[in-house]
Amino acid sequence: MNRLPSSASALACSAHALNLIEKRTLNHEEMKALNREVIDYFKEHVNPGFLEYRKSVTAGGDYGAVEWQAGSLNTLVDTQGQEFIDCLGGFGIFNVGHRNPVVVSAVQNQLAKQPLHSQELLDPLRAMLAKTLAALTPGKLKYSFFCNSGTESVEAALKLAKAYQSPRGKFTFIATSGAFHGKSLGALSATAKSIFRRPFMPLLPGFRHVPFGNIDAMSMAFSEGKKTGDEIAAVILEPIQGEGGVILPPQGYLTEVRKLCDEFGALMILDEVQTGMGRTGKMFACEHENVQPDILCLAKALGGGVMPIGATIATEEVFSVLFDNPFLHTTTFGGNPLACAAALATINVLLEQNLPAQAEQKGDTLLDGFRQLAREYPNLVHDARGKGMLMAIEFVDNETGYRFASEMFRQRVLVAGTLNNAKTIRIEPPLTLTIELCEQVLKSARNALAAMQVSVEEV
C-alpha cells in the first residue's frame, strides 16, 4: 500500500529538528531520545548499511555514538557528552581544525550579506578565490572551476582533458590500481576498487589501470597506446593514495610520470583532494618533487571543515577550451559566496599559521611512535607509513584493524579504515593537533594494542 504524503508530519519533523539545532546542550533523556531517533531514521530513511559500518565506533556495538558538536579545534563531542580526539579528520576535511574561528567568522560575515549568488551578476569572492589559487598553486596553473566535492572536481578535470585532447585524436586515460577518485560515473571509471565499480558496469570506456608506483608499467602503457593508435589523453593519479591505504610511491615517481606526459603529449591530472591543503607537509603533495600538473583537483579541506567546496585548477592552455562557451560545464552551487569565503579563510589560516610545516613536524612525531609500536607488536601490526599528517597503520588482517578502531574508540580516539584497504587504519587528524594530543594519541594506541595482545594470548 502506497504511503500518502503528510504535510503535517513533515512540518512536525522539521520543527523538531530546528528546535534541536537551536539547543547548545541536551539533558540525559533528550540525549537518549535523540540517539533512538537517529538510529531509527538511518535505518528507515537513510541507509541501514551505515549502521553496520559504524559499529566499530561504538563502545558496545549498539550504534550509541551520535555526533553532536565540535569540542575544540581537535575534538568531537557526542550526544552523551563524551569527547574524542579526532584522528580521522572527516577523511581529510578538518585540516584547520573543527569550527576554526577565522573560517566560521568569514562565513558568518558573508551570510549576513549574501549567502548565494544571483547567477547573473559577477560574484567577487569567486574571482578572488580563483586569483588566490593561481598564486598558491605550482607552475602555470591559472584558471579555476569551482564545484562542491572531490568527485565533482575530478569529473570537471576529465571533461576538461577530453575537450582539450579530443581534437588531437587522444581519448584514453591512464589511472592506477588502488586509486580512488570518487564515485560519480566518470570518476568511478578512474577509481580502481571492484566493489564500487561492478554494480555500475559498464563504466565509461577509455580507461586503463596500471600498477601505482611502477613507472615501467606506466611507460609501457604509453608506448602501447602509441603503437596501436590509441594514444593517451591524460594520466590521473593521487600523489599518495589515500583510500588505497596511504600508499606512497617510490621517490621520483611523479617526476618520471611528468616526463612521460611531456614526451607523449598527454596531460597530467593530479588528484590532491586528500593530499592537498598542507596535509603532507607541503601545501600540495606534488611539491615534494617540484612537479607541476596540467590540472589539479582540490576539495575536502579547501572549505575549512565549514563549507563544501571543490576546485579544478588548470593551465591557461588547457582551460582555454572553455573560453568560447563557459557554459559547457557549470554547476548551480559551485563557487557560491559562502563556500568561497570559507576557502579564502582556510588558505589564510594555513599560511598565517604555517600549518603545512606543523603537519610535517607533528606527523614525524606520530609516525615515529607508530613505527615503534609496529616493532613491539609484529604479530598485530604489519606496517606504519605516511607523510606529514596523512598516516596509516596496516594490520595483519581486516579483523585486527577493526578491533584496533574499536579499542581506540574506547580510548576516546576516533580512527577508521580506508575504503580500498580494510586492514589499514588511517590516521588523518587536524593539522592543528597539539603536541600534547599527539602524545595522548600514541599512549592510546599503545593501550589499544596491549589490550589486543592480551586477547590474542588468551585464545
From Swiss-Prot:
Residue(s) carrying N6-(pyridoxal phosphate)lysine: K300
Keywords, in A-Z order: Aminotransferase, Pyridoxal phosphate, Transferase
HAMAP family: Putres_aminotrans_3
Reaction(s) catalysed (UniProt annotation): an alkane-alpha,omega-diamine + 2-oxoglutarate = an omega-aminoaldehyde + L-glutamate; putrescine + 2-oxoglutarate = 1-pyrroline + L-glutamate + H2O; cadaverine + 2-oxoglutarate = 5-aminopentanal + L-glutamate
InterPro entries tied to this protein: Aminotrans_3, Aminotrans_3_PPA_site, Class-III_PLP-dep_AT, Putrescine_aminotransferase, PyrdxlP-dep_Trfase, PyrdxlP-dep_Trfase_major, PyrdxlP-dep_Trfase_small
Binding site residues for pyridoxal 5'-phosphate: G150, T151, Q274, T332
Record protein name field: Putrescine aminotransferase
Keyword Transferase: yes
Sequence similarity: Belongs to the class-III pyridoxal-phosphate-dependent aminotransferase family. Putrescine aminotransferase subfamily.
